[in-house]
């Protein structure tokens, strides 16, 4: 909000008619997505959650094409999504992937994925006549406040360590990264079809594995044959959706 206010040279405050848009985005992009995600993550494996989360790209394109009718669902988009999903499955090949379905685990991760997909489509619709930075900033502020209240009512508490400065700095750093990422994401959705942008979400698990190799010393796991195959599949999916999915 502060950055947007500086860029616009005026306070970035939503108008009364824009409040429902902020509330709708806050509900889907922050409250429901993270509420279902963290509860689900606590009740399922990281492998399964990665695969289900990867389906958000496919869900995004389906909702954009079939529900909101913002673009056409072409065979190239379907092929690209299938390749991207295959890449996520390959990079997460593990026995735990085949374990039983859990409603509060796998089910909640799936609901989180649907909430995220709906929020992406809403950003596309709302950004036609509303500032994207304003939407991102205020929906995060509202959603964060609601999530804080829910956490406190559910028995959570705020406890600071003996040296709180590193923890506070890390919290602000993560908040800054999230705000920047979602603001850029919103701008991209404003000027491009949902499918062309959403398909890059397939890179999330691949980047996670590669960054783990560079930053956490997990090179042996990251540079497996499965990781390289996944990178090829995901890259092919992105290329097909962007180069063949729409006539320029």
Annotate the PLM regions.
Residues 27, 38-39, 99-128, 133, ...:
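Glycine-/small-residue-enriched transmembrane alpha-helix faces in small-molecule transporters
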Residues 1-32, 55-63, 115-119, 136-155, ...:
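Transmembrane alpha-helices of multi-pass small-molecule transport proteins
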Residues 167, 202-248:
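C-terminal-most transmembrane helix of multi-pass membrane proteins
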Residues 30, 34, 49-55, 123-145, ...:
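Helix-helix packing/entry segments at the starts of transmembrane helices
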Residues 50-53, 69-90, 99-105, 217-237:
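Loop-to-transmembrane alpha-helix entry segments
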Residues 14-20, 93-115, 152-172, 221-231:
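Juxtamembrane helix-entry segments on the extracytoplasmic side of multipass membrane proteins
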Residues 17-24, 72-85, 106, 130-139:
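Cytoplasmic-side transmembrane-helix entry/capping segments in multi-pass membrane proteins
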Residues 5-53, 86-90, 174-192:
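Specific transmembrane alpha-helical segments of multi-pass solute transporters/efflux pumps
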